[in-house]
Amino acid sequence: MAAPYRQPEEAVDDSEFIDDHHDHLRDTVHHRLRANSAIMQFQKILVANRGEIPIRIFRTAHELSLQTVAIFSHEDRLSMHRQKADEAYMIGHRGQYTPVGAYLAADEIVKIALEHGVHLIHPGYGFLSENADFARKVEKAGMVFVGPTPDTIDSLGDKVSARQLAIRCNVPVVPGTEGPVERYEEVKAFTDTYGFPIIIKAAFGGGGRGMRVVRNQADLRDSFERATSEARSAFGNGTVFVERFLDKPKHIEVQLLGDNHGNVVHLFERDCSVQRRHQKVVEVAPAKDLPTDVRDRILSDAVKLAKSVNYRNAGTAEFLVDQQNRHYFIEINPRIQVEHTITEEITGIDIVAAQIQIAAGATLEQLGLTQDRISTRGFAIQCRITTEDPSKGFSPDTGKIEVYRSAGGNGVRLDGGNGFAGAIITPHYDSMLVKCTCRGSTYEIARRKVVRALVEFRIRGVKTNIPFLTSLLSHPTFVDGNCWTTFIDDTTELFALVGSQNRAQKLLAYLGDVAVNGSSIKGQMGEPKFKGEIIKPKLLDAQGKPLDVSHPCTKGWKQIIDQEGPVAFAKAVRANKGCLIMDTTWRDAHQSLLATRVRTIDLLNIAHETSHALSNAYSLECWGGATFDVAMRFLYEDPWDRLRKMRKAVPNIPFQMLLRGANGVAYSSLPDNAIYHFCKNAKKCGVDIFRVFDALNDVDQLEVGIKAVHAAEGVVEATVCYSGDMLNPKKKYNLEYYLALVDKIVALKPHVLGIKDMAGVLKPQAARLLVGSIRERYPDLPIHVHTHDSAGTGVASMIACAQAGADAVDAATDSMSGMTSQPSIGAILASLEGTEHDPGLNSAHVRALDSYWAQLRLLYSPFEANLTGPDPEVYEHEIPGGQLTNLIFQASQLGLGQQWAETKKAYEVANDLLGDIVKVTPTSKVVGDLAQFIVSNKLSAQDVIDRAAELDFPGSVLEFLEGLMGQPFGGFPEPLRSRALRNRRKLDKRPGLYLEPLDLAAIKNQIREQFGSATEYDVASYAMYPKVFEDYKKFVQKYGDLSVLPTRYFLAKPEIGEEFHVELEKGKMLILKLLAIGPLSEQTGQREVFYEVNGEVRQVSIDDKKASIDNTARPKADVGDSSQVGAPMSGVVVEIRVHDGLEVKKGDPLAVLSAMKMEMVISAPHSGKVSGLLVKEGDSVDGQDLVCKITKA
């Protein structure tokens, strides 16, 4: 047990403490009576309470040299108050009492006190503090009750009796019932006389429980029943009384102290107006700007009332002050209040010490507490920090506190209970963790201290009200000190909260999951081959001196776009003598080789060097296409955040993105307004050149994207998708086809013409013919050619394009080039160096960049497709480079890995069945899906056609045949189309014409409601990929922003004892070390993972996904299913009001939950029929546990 504080045993002249005639007493404000003094004949005190108030009392008791005794329920056996006492005893035995009932077991508590030689019992507040019978039992047992006499508690603890007392003393009261009210009919009679609004209050007890404001007849009966039920549960007595409810009053209370000789003093007032559900949230002492005459009348009336009943010990007289500064007596609380701390701070008086010493027989004068000696100095403000979630109606949160760091410093006082790391917060008790009291010489200084202290707290593992308190304390009305009792309910902007980011703990949750379960990144095979620090290259100038790359280069082709616009840019590109390079390393290269898995942190790490080395590049292909959804889906990154960061780091090179025409970056057509919205935001965020294509070369589809980019004022690079072999007269797509297509595209006024050879089947001789023919027809039109090096002829083809008149060609850094990626930039530069087509890049700088990527590729080795060389067979199967590696992975996942050759052949078959279509995302996916379908079902081409009416084709195949991807050149294949679609529609125009515009404002509101905030970029992401976006946001809510985590630790756990760093933002670094992974808990299926964070040990509980446990947890309500009703909080079901099959209306009560002394009605979210009721009265539930379903009528 905690050892009490002991003063040195020294000779003391007791007379100096008890002789109230000594002159020096008049010069002393507050004396302490030691336990061995003539008055303090008592040695041991028991506190009949829990949480922070016993700790507060124990501290003073130790200062008075008293021995201390704590009591606790079984559920409270790990609570801090038990450890702060010299002795601690459990109330009864396990299961004998409910968690709250244990602290209401008066006989058992008295029995414990007698058994262990207790002399004084302090009741604290709540529980038995206002129970006169308990006080009588204490005194009857020969002990001293630290509080008023039982008779006083009877007369004042009953608010109706206190009201009658006020009337006799000519103290103004609010109109209300003359006596206790037990029946609904009595309440109804009062409203018939006085009207609404009214307030129903528990006659015994406080803290806002058993209290309801009723504003209309419809809510009267239910409010009466809830108030009486809460009062009975909290105080053991359901009696209530009724008063007229005052609108926007202030709540002012006066701290009183009385002794056994009829002396009463006040310790001035507190302003407790800031309340929620009649529970005080923030208190101020003294009241700011209360008129002096009003203050004097309130203080005088408070003392008058106390003296009229010979009040003994500490108590509080409470008043309401209306907007005309008229005051009305409410009640006297015959106990110490939660907020007594602020009075102590401004008066310097220890109220608890005074309580104990008065109970021992001291007079106020002996304690130096005469009214003329009591004054205030400065201001004090108290906040109650609770485990409540303000964003969910302040529903109490439960769980384990993982991190607890307190505030401190000058003028900060903390009175805590169960606020410590490792504490288990249960639904059984009050949700308060700690009281934070700050004092200052002025109200504003005190307010600023509280705000600072709140920001200083770090509490993780449970939700807290700290963000709300910070918002409240910063509101102009609070700053002015003009709050009223319903200020919180009346001020919705208080709930525009900026919550704590909780970044470290969320990051630990992810790292812990990787430590226990390994990486969950789809497509990852094993751990990285490279685990060292990547060495960044140095760029040298012509004299061999290192370039300063601490800042990015600011000179490049982008400056022409920014300063002169897209048209001038196009003219400048066309006028340029050399053939420019677009570097694809940041997008298509890693898409083709590493499954699009390269993360933002690794791009930014080489960004400044890239801006210098490639300053004369046509563009960096770095965004759009598959990188957009993969960023959210697999890397858990925001693609817009990536774009913003890249743009800042590389301000000089134009950024190019891939736009799938009317699809945006999605896989099927979207309403036109979604495309326009997307392009507008992409341009705003940093994209310069939009390479717009349509997967079927459908010009109607392509036109949507082109017009959207024009509207966004971006550079339009309208693109022809190259497929087949134009030199083969048997092939579908010949030179005439491409030239006719180019004519249609040029009519749409693009700035640049793109040629997209997605499979790498553009042979050098075909390249010369195609590019040369276009150049001849359109001599002023810039041409940019994109290819893949799958067949190994990419370098030759790109050189051929340059020689035929192309203005820009694609390449990738050497170590990320070849095979399904783009041709080698080093090889192209070497081939064109010194010629009229020289790209104008520094080869040494380009090679230096490549040294970084050579290391990085090893870091991403788990995503390699293990291709070993060129595949000229691509001229037969025509699988796009970006799809080939993904198709290999998909085949292995489907169990077709051993049939890869067969899958490639099936790709040719599928392409022919679909009409030899242009193959690029999303149509390439259609062909790939059909190929795998053919292999897995062992079908021939004829089987597919003959059995089309009965086969369950992949969804992408049906969408293509339906026309949702546009119209293919030459039409759809028949009879396959009609047979496969059966009764589905057939579109003969572009799909966007059949789609209603998206309600973008509604989407934004939906995102805001679901995730707390929403930007236009969020709307754009949702429009493209609703489910992917929602899943990503939920992941981030759980694990935070993982883009800051070094890739090695994103993909694999560190070694035990290995230290590594994570830079959360500039100047904020976490120093982490994995310490241990605990054993599997058979009860929970979890393992504890221990990390050291900035030298502090933290732990997280992680579900072991490999463990087989008996999961008896209740099913959770699916928030996406409106028919499912979940519990709004953890608690106990105290009442069920429905049954299966019952028809209910929206808002009808379904059940009542009780948690932390608060009851909450679960209401029907909509009308319908109840089914699947899963709870019964007495059941314990957690937040979001499924209660029932309501099927809409």
Curated annotation (Swiss-Prot):
**Keyword check for Phosphoprotein:** no
Where does the record place a coiled coil? none
One GO biological process term is:
gluconeogenesis
Sites where N6-biotinyllysine occurs are at 1157
What residues bind ATP, as annotated? 159, 243, 278
InterPro entries registered for this protein in UniProt:
Aldolase_TIM, ATP-grasp, BC-like_N, Biotin_BS, Biotin_carboxylation_dom, Biotin_COase_C, Biotin_lipoyl, Carboxylase_cons_dom
User: Which residues participate directly in catalysis?
Assistant: 335
Any keyword Transcription?
no
Q: Name one GO cellular component term.
A: cytoplasm
Cofactor requirements of the protein? biotin; Zn(2+)
**Reaction catalysed?**
hydrogencarbonate + pyruvate + ATP = oxaloacetate + ADP + phosphate + H(+)
Q: Where is the Biotinyl-binding domain?
A: 1116-1191
Q: Keywords on this record?
A: ATP-binding, Biotin, Cytoplasm, Gluconeogenesis, Ligase, Metal-binding, Multifunctional enzyme, Nucleotide-binding, Pyruvate, Zinc
The protein's annotated pathway: Carbohydrate biosynthesis; gluconeogenesis
**Annotated substrate binding sites:** 587-591, 660, 921
Return the CDD domains for the record.
Answer: biotinyl_domain (cd06850), DRE_TIM_PC_TC_5S (cd07937)
Where's it found, cell-wise? Cytoplasm
Q: Where does a divalent metal cation bind?
A: 588, 756, 786, 788
Biotin carboxylation domain residues are 41-493
Q: Which NCBIfam families match?
A: PRK09282.1 (NF006761), PRK12999.1 (NF009554), pyruv_carbox (TIGR01235)
Instruction: Describe its function.
Output: Pyruvate carboxylase catalyzes a 2-step reaction, involving the ATP-dependent carboxylation of the covalently attached biotin in the first step and the transfer of the carboxyl group to pyruvate in the second.
What is this protein called in UniProt? Pyruvate carboxylase
- Organism of origin is Aspergillus terreus (strain NIH 2624 / FGSC A1156)
